[in-house]
Structures are given as structure tokens and as C-alpha cells.
């Protein structure tokens, strides 16, 4: 009482201090605050109106919270999780009937918990979960009937436990065994049922040293034969201890015997010297027994068996779920003795109990409706006795989420249908792809055939065009009089031969090979040897064909002669190379250039081509006829050679290139027909005339030199003497003609690319269009033949013609005399 008085006085002093300092933070709670808003104490007891739940407006830094004497009915984790600093919590004298499992798990600093004078019915492990620092636990004056053996396992630091004034009948021997710091355990005013099940707890209690020494207030209330016995034998009516009685009656197998049933009493009286059958205690000896162990009366009093609660424990009410639906449930309740007590089915919702129905049958099915999914519903079987409600067993129901409707299960026939459909689709795709592939391949073949036909047609047309270009004058003027024989003319009376390409430029005028269209090779050595006709050499490769054997028989004599002069040809080629090398070696300085003489064939070819190969006889005549037909309308012009002129290196180089090109161009037509010595006319100078002709040809731009890029500037030819008188034997003006503008078809036959642009792909020459367009695969074939060196494609007559063209009068006669000697020696 003194302690309570001092506590009340302290509360009054604290309240007065708050009123004086203005520390009243809320109208419903008295707060004692520290620095920076820290709250030490919050007194919320006896609130008007009383609290029905833990208030949330209190600062979370609170250390001491007092909510006693309100109407709080439940303790939830959500309402206490904010108060992490809480060390003292007073919930005394409320209406708490439900504590959520883990409700105090956020108060790991809590040391004092007061829950006295409430309506708790049982104590479980989950209620005290997380209270590792708890030291004082007050649960007095509740309705606790069951204390689980694991209730205090998470509270190893408990020093004081108060479970007095409850309804505890049984306690397990291991309930308080793990509490090493326990010094006070108040269990008085509980209706203990003294049976063999309580023997283990009584042994622990006898060994425990209770600081309060309240043994006289712990008594047995049932069974009636042991009513009034003290748990430890210290009482007002003698020294009767239930511990000694149970130790004398109960054995190690007492729990198994109690499950089977109560022991049968001994029949008859016990005789001295003979032991009664178990389970009575051993027979008394002659020695006097202790006062607390002797029975009243004489020794012939029969032993009375102690009734136990084993049958009652087995006969507890049972509740189980029978059926669950979307919004309802059916439960089954079994009662051992429905008429011994009044049983009801209660629904607990946050410690608020509501009666569902009264239970009056030994087994009854109850349907629960208007339930929601994913919601916990707790139902308990409660009995009422002497105005008190006893909770026997509970059941929690949670309706699951509505299951989704199951999808249709495919039948075996449906699965087979799906499989066949998939296989059919795959087979159809294969057929479609095959058809597409067949169509594409067929179309490709048709395109290839069309390309081949077009190439053949183009080749035929080109062949015809080339023939017309080369032999057009013969077709147009077949009655043209041949050139009359006569002596060689002087320079002033000689007509000019059209401009011809050089020998080194022969390769670029060959037709590019193709897989479909044959191409021609002009002036090659094999042409001379085999004697192919000119029509075959226009659009075919210069290689011997299958009919070459017949041609060899006809030209065997001439071929042998040509073989004999191979050495002369090689010497001529060497001479050409030496001339080119010596010409390129001149870079600057005054240079005197002697223009080479120009050669003209003025005699008829029918009588002057005894030493020519068959391939050169007709072509030479055609070129001369074409030349004369074009020159007929051209004005005459004389040209003189320039010597001793001083020019810059660039101008000299440009003129030298022009001279080389002019000489090469003049050599083209002489190769076609190499006449005898008496049919060659020397025209001096020729380089100036050829330069003027090339310069004017480029100005006309009629595909005469169709190649990209710039050309070296050629200086104009110096003025020459007046043109010589015409040659009467030819019936036309015998003079050097200016380059005339010929008709386009004929002009294209003479227009070739410059040899310095061999590598360029663009060309407007009609001879280059003889090949068919090649596909991309044919262009990159590794087996394509590469161009050979220029010396390999130079014909024998080619070199000889060049040497004859640039030779002077004496040299020309020497060459021809040597040629005749070789021929005569070969014939002999």
C-alpha cells in the first residue's frame, strides 16, 4: 500500500509540473517532454471519453506510455509498431480480450508490460514474441485458463511473472524451466486441479525459491477429495501437501494409466505383511508414519483412487471444417456432454465476441454465410458456468481466392486434329516454296536464253556492221578502178594515208572475251599463220579454229616464208622499243625532230602482194579504197617538217606523243596489206600532218577518241608548201588530205581508244560492243583469261610493216631485197 501511495503522489507531482510549465501537449494526454520534442512520459489513463484503441497521435519517441483504465479491447501490431523506444507500457484495467501474434515485436526495448485486469483467456507464444528484454510481466486478474509451455521461450530475461487470480488448472513442468533470472512467480488464487499431470510442475515449484513466499495461497480446488490441499503442504489446517500425496500415488507411467482410465480400488482390506496390488502405495511398516502422510482411522481403511481429468481432457469439444464455398462455410461441432454445461458458438472479431448459435446437440453442423474471400474468421466453442465464459477450442477459417475457370482440356481427337493441321500447314509451305523455287529457276533460265539470243543477235548485227564499215566502199562502188601501177612518187605529189594506230595499241582494239559471243583479234600472228577469213577475225578470238587444218594447206608456202623472217620481226620490235626509249629519254632542251616519212600504196594490189599473207591482201585494198573514197572531197594540203625548233619540255613531250600516235595510227592500215617495194610511196613529213589530223579529229568529237580525261596539247602544224599537182595515173588529186568528217558508221571503224587509256572501261568504239554483257559471277571468275603482254599479240606482218613504214629509201630497198632473197632461198 505504501508503494501505491508513493506512485500516486509521484503522478500528482508530475501533473502539477506539466500544468505549471505548459507541458500539456494534448487535451487528452499529459506529456512530459525533453529536448527537441523527445517525450518521456505520456499519461493517457482515465480518458474521457475512454480510449477503445491505442491512440496514434502520440509522439513515436515516447518511452513511458500509460493507457490504463480505458476501454481498449485489442492490441494490434499496427498500433504499436511506431513506438520503438517504448520501455514501459501500462494497459491495466481495460477490456483487452485479443492480442495479435507478434503485436509487441516492434518493442524490442520493452522491459515492463502490465496487462492485469483484462479479459485474456489464454497465453500463447505469439503474444510475447520479440520481447527479448522483457523483465516484468503482469497478467493478474484475467480469465487465463491455458498457458502454453512455449509462452515464455522468447523472454529469457523475465524476473517477475504475475499470473495470480486467473483460471489456471494445469501447468506444464517446462513452462518456467528456461527462465534462469526468474525470482518471483505469483500463482495464487488459481483453481488448480491436483492430478498426476500437475506432478511435474509441483516438483519444479518445490525446487523454485519464490521471493514472495505465498505458499499458503496456492491450493487445490479439485478434485473434491483434495480440495483445500496446499501445493507445497504449508497451510492452516495441518501440514497437508498435495505433492507428497501425488508422489505416493503416481508412478512414472501415470500419464499412460490416466489415458486408459482411473485406477481400480483395492478389494477387501489390506493384510499386514502383504503388499496390495498397484497402484496403492506400499504397505505400511511397523514404524510410525509422519503426520502429513498417515490416513485417519486405523490401517484397515481402504484406499480411495484419485479421479483424474484424463477423460475430461479427451472429452473436450471439437470443431472442424466440413465444406468451404465461395461465400460460405460449413463447420461441424462435437460436444462431450452438451447438457452438463451451456455451450455456444462465438465469432471473435478483434476481441469482440458475437454469438452465432447455441449448441444443444452432441454433434451439430452449422452453416456460416456472408463470408468474404481472403479474410480470417475465428469461431470458438464457449461454455458458460457460474456467470463465467470459458473458451474451449477455436477455429480460424479463411476462404481462398476464387479459382479461375479451368480451360477446356483437349480431347485426344482434338489433339490429333491439331497435329495433323500443323503437319498439313508445313507440307503446304514446302509445296509453295518448291513452286516458287521452280518458277524462279525457270524464269532465270528463260532470261539466260533471252540474254544469249540477244547477245547472238547483237553479235550478228555487230558483225554485219563491222563488215559494212570495213567493206562498205566495195559494196557501194564495186567498179572503182584499181590503183594504177607507177613509180614511187615524190613527197610533193604523194597522197596521204589515213591516220592509223601504233603497233603497241593493237591489244586495246581487241574484243573483250565473252562466254557467249566470239571476239576478233586483229593482226595477230596466228591469224597470219592460219589464214582465217576477215569475217571470222572481226568478232572472234584470234585463236585457231577447228577448220584451221584446211587453211594451212593453202597457205603453207607463205607460212614458211613468214617463219623465216621471224628474226627480222624481232629486230623490228627491238628497233621500235629502242626508238620509244630514246624518245622518252629527252626531257628538255632544244631538240631537232626529223619527221619520219609517210608510206602510201599507190599501185594496184592485185599484182603487188606476192609476199603478203592471205589475211593482208584483201584488207589492204579495202582500206585504200575507203581512204580514197573519203579523200575525194577533201582539200589538198602540204606539210613541212619542223627541225631545229626550240620548245619547252612540256610542249616537246606533247609533240612527241602526237608523233608517236600518228606513226602508230598510220601503221594500222599498212598492216592490212603490205605491198611490194615499188608500191610504197614515201611522204615527208608525216608527223606534222598526223598531228594536225589528230588535233582536228579530237575537235570534231565524233567518237574518234572516246576516252575520258585530258589529252596533251598538240602544237599546230607549221605551214607547209602548196599542195603538189595531182597524180594523173590515179584519176584523182594526189595530195595529203586534211582529216575529213566521215559518216558516223565509217568513222567509228577507225576510232579507237588511245593506248594510254587501256585500263579504262568506257569506250564508244563499235568493236568493243561486240561482247555480250557478263554476269557478276562471270566477271569475278578466277579462270578468266588475262590480257597478255603487248609483244605476244604483235603479228609478224605488224612489225615488218612498222619497220618498212619508217624506213628511208635506201633502208627500204635493203629490207625488200633481203625479203626477196629469203623467199627465193626458201622456195629453192
From Swiss-Prot:
The keyword Cytoplasm does not apply. One of its GO terms (cellular component) is axon terminus. Residues 440-828 are cytoplasmic. Residues 28-418 are extracellular. LRR repeats lie at residues 61-82, 85-106, 109-130, 133-154, 157-178, 318-342. Glycans are attached at residues 59, 85, 90, 122, 210, 376. The keyword Repressor does not apply. Residues 632-649 have a biased composition (Low complexity). Residues 259-291, 517-552, 624-649, 696-732 are annotated as: Disordered. Residues 529-541, 696-705 have a biased composition (Basic and acidic residues). Residues 190-252 form the LRRCT domain. GO terms for biological process: chemical synaptic transmission; establishment of protein localization; synapse assembly; synapse organization; synaptic membrane adhesion; visual perception. GO terms for molecular function: protein phosphatase inhibitor activity. Interacts with PPP1CA. This is Protein ELFN1. The gene is ELFN1.
